[in-house]
Each structure stands twice: as structure tokens, then as C-alpha cells.
Design a protein with these regions (language model features):
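Glycine-rich, positively charged N-terminal anion/phosphate-binding segment
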Residues: 2-7, 27-101
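Glycine-rich beta-to-alpha transition loops that act as phosphate-gripper elements at the mouths
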Residues: 22-24, 106-110, 175-181, 246-258
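Catalytic cores of alpha/beta
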Residues: 29-33, 115-122, 179-192, 242-243, ...
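Glycine-rich phosphate-binding active-site loops on the catalytic face of alpha/beta enzymes
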Residues: 44-49, 135-140, 196-206, 253-254, ...
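C-terminal helical cap(s) of enzyme catalytic domains, especially alpha/beta-barrels
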Residues: 52-70, 208-222, 276-301
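Active-site beta->alpha loop and helix N-cap motifs at the rims of alpha/beta catalytic domains
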Residues: 67-150
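Glycine/Thr-rich beta-alpha phosphate-binding loop at enzyme active sites
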Residues: 73-74, 139-154, 185-242, 246, ...
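Iron-sulfur cluster-binding cysteine motifs and their immediate structural context
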Residues: 341-359, 370-383
Length: 383
């Protein structure tokens, strides 16, 4: 049987799955339930002072986007923990600790670095925190916190520097995807002393408009999460993993063991999940871990060290890929159902039908691969 244990920033986890800072961990009992389901680590909703600018709406703050009835993502107007710092310190962290998972505590980067340092000291003095995760990345906060700090390498550096100086346990920082170049921000965090980075928080977004009423589904800007954001997260993850030597916790779009493996193959040390639990409950944690264990055994891997970062070397610039020999669509006639989807979607007009059989013309095929992705029978390949 594979050993699912991993080490992140010097702390050992029983498996690489972590409950991200979000609604399922809004209190100590939620974190304890996640731990009871088998998760390796838990992160509470971001802890900070109870201020007016930290309050979130209670009149509907989640809007789910669907494609053909299937949820693909959601916009949320969640901010930070609605429990006060004192409630977490006096009661909730102790409840969460009873679950037995690693306690990776999310704290808010305050408007001034010295305020952040004070919060760091308050949380770690409880003795319940194993690591700290500094939130400089919430996509819809007041103008002095969240991504307004994390979009700036200079402000991120100052916050991490102050927090790390006050910390006696591993200190990490959660980055924002709402930037052009995350590498610059991650490098600044490393230079300031961060032990690790989380990639990443949600994407600033808008829910949309009900065209029957002309009113937005939700009136405020929110954070987009779920499966639809995974390609964006993978882009940031790979760029940082290839350019900054720092442990990474990946989060965004994890709905099963497959994404856990993908993120680790792209350089992540561990992987956080939120939406899967929000959509399916804490039992989803157990399913993902069991599936992960079965996959590792099936592949013959003994530990995640064997696969961590193995996909990074395959990434290449487009100009290099353009020099590779072209490939052309080939239709397996024994599998093809003659549905015609490939022909309808081929804008190079390379696919045609004759006597009930579909053919691909190499002279017209441009090797885009759309037909291979859209064929419901998996009858088309590029070769």
C-alpha cells in the first residue's frame, strides 16, 4: 500500500489533501468534521478583527454557474471569518484541534504590517496552530486588505517580512490570481522569508444578469471558484514552480483525486479543496482520499515524491511546439457512429462523409484537435 504522507514546510501530513479556507471550515466543529473524514490538514476561514469592512452579506452570497445543468463554478461574496478573533482563540481552535488534522491557520494581512505581526503572535500563542497562512488575496475586500496587498510585490514583501519575524512556526502566504505575473509576487514572498506559498485564492468576477428582470443575480463583485478555474490555477502554479524554489500548496477546482494528482505532478507539495466539499459534504473528503490511495496502488507508486513535478519538464513555449511535426485527424471507422459532429465543427472543412462513412482529408486538416475533443465516441485521434 502506498504511503500517502507528505511533508510541507517541515510539517508532516497524513495525506496531501487539505480543507481550504472557506465555508466548510467556518467554525471549529466544521474543521473537526473534515478531520474526522480523513483530511490531512484543515484551514479555518481567515481570522481577523471583527470590523465592518470584514462583514459579508447574509441575503444570498453564492451563485452557481452551470453548463447543460452541471455545475462548473460559483461566484461567492464570502469575506473573512464572521467569528471574532477572540472566539477562535478562546474556543473554536481547540475544538478543531480535537480532529487530529494539521492545523494550518489562515490569518488576515492587516492594513499595517505591525498589526499583522500582532495577529500572528496572538494566534500562535494559543498553541493550536501548526502553520500559518497569510491572506493577502481575497478578491473583494476593503481597499486596504486582501488582493490590494497581494497584487503588489512590495506590499506583499512588507507583510510577509513582518509576519515571518513574529512567527515561531512555519509561515506561508496565500497569493492572488488577479495579477499578470505571480512569479514576481512569489519571489517577493520568498525573499521576505515565507516558508511556502498557496496558489491561489479565487478570481475576481461577477455573477451575471437575469435577462427577464434586468437585475444582476448578485449585485457585488465576488470570487470565482470551482472546476472552471483549474486551467488558470495550473498556469500560475507551473510558472511559480519553474521559477521560484519554494514549497507550494495548490488550490482551485479540485473535485476528485485526479486534480490532486495533476497538481502534484505540476509541482505542488499538497492540495487544498473547498468546492467539492461545499457541493457534496464532508464525505467527499473520504472518497477523494480512498480514490487517491487506490490510484497510487494501481500505478505502483510508493510515495508522492515519485510523481511530484514530473510534468513540468514537458512544458514548452508555443514557438517550440510549432516546430514539431504536424499531426492529422484519423477516424476509426469501427468506432465511428457517423453522428457528424466532427464534420460540423471542422472549420477547415477537412472532414466529409461518403457512403455513410466519415473521412478526414490530410490536405485540409490543420491539426487543431477539436474533433478529437468533441467526438462522443472517441473515434477521432491525431497522429
Amino acid at each position: 500500500m502506498a504511503n500517502l504522507e507528505i511533508t510541507y514546510c517541515g510539517v508532516k501530513y497524513r495525506n496531501p489533501l487539505i480543507l481550504a479556507s472557506a465555508t466548510p471550515g467556518w467554525d471549529g466543529e466544521g474543521l473537526r468534521l473534515a478531520a474526522a473524514a480523513g483530511i490531512g490538514g484543515v484551514i479555518p476561514k481567515t481570522i481577523g478583527p471583527k470590523q465592518d469592512w470584514a462583514a459579508h452579506p447574509r441575503n444570498g452570497r453564492i451563485f452557481m454557474h452551470r453548463y447543460k445543468g452541471r455545475p462548473i463554478g460559483q461566484v461567492n461574496l464570502e469575506l473573512f471569518s464572521t467569528m471574532s478573533r477572540d472566539e477562535w482563540i478562546s474556543k473554536e481552535l481547540e475544538i478543531a484541534k480535537k480532529g487530529g488534522a494539521v492545523m494550518h491557520i489562515s490569518i488576515l494581512a492587516m492594513p499595517e504590517p505591525d498589526e499583522t505581526a500582532a495577529l500572528v503572535r496572538q494566534i500562535q500563542e494559543t498553541g493550536f496552530a501548526d502553520l500559518l497562512e497569510l491572506n493577502v488575496s481575497c478578491p473583494m475586500p476593503a481597499s486596504t486588505v486582501g488582493m490590494h496587498i497581494g497584487k503588489s510585490a512590495e506590499r506583499t514583501y512588507k507583510q510577509v517580512k513582518a509576519g515571518k519575524a513574529a512567527a515561531s512556526i512555519p509561515f506561508t502566504v496565500k497569493l492572488t490570481p488577479n495579477v499578470t505575473d505571480m512569479v514576481e509576487i512569489a519571489q517577493a514572498a520568498k525573499e521576505a522569508g515565507a516558508d511556502g506559498v498557496t496558489i491561489s485564492n479565487s478570481i475576481r468576477s461577477f455573477s451575471g444578469v437575469d435577462i427577464e428582470t434586468g437585475k444582476p443575480y448578485m449585485r457585488g463583485y465576488g470570487g470565482y471558484t470551482g472546476p472552471a478555474i483549474k486551467p488558470v490555477i495550473m498556469r500560475h502554479l507551473t510558472e511559480v514552480a519553474r521559477n521560484v524554489d519554494i514549497p507550494i500548496s495548490a488550490v482551485g477546482g479540485v473535485t476528485g483525486f485526479h486534480e490532486v494528482v495533476e497538481y502534484i505532478m505540476l509541482g505542488a507539495s499538497n492540495v487544498q479543496t473547498c468546492t467539492a466539499v461545499m457541493w457534496n459534504g464532508y464525505g467527499e473528503i473520504t472518497r477523494i482520499i480512498n480514490d487517491l490511495n487506490n490510484w497510487m496502488d494501481k500505478k505502483g507508486y510508493k510515495s508522492f515524491d515519485e510523481i511530484r513535478g514530473i510534468a513540468l519538464k514537458e512544458i514548452a513555449p508555443i514557438e517550440e511546439l510549432a516546430l514539431l511535426p504536424p499531426k492529422f485527424a484519423k477516424i476509426d471507422k469501427s468506432v465511428c457512429t457517423n453522428c457528424g459532429i466532427c464534420e460540423k465543427l471542422c472549420f477547415y472543412r477537412a472532414i466529409s462523409e461518403k457512403n455513410g462513412i466519415r473521412f478526414a482529408d490530410k490536405g485540409r486538416c490543420d491539426g487543431c484537435g477539436v474533433c478529437t475533443q468533441m467526438c462522443p465516441a472517441n473515434a477521432v485521434v491525431l497522429e
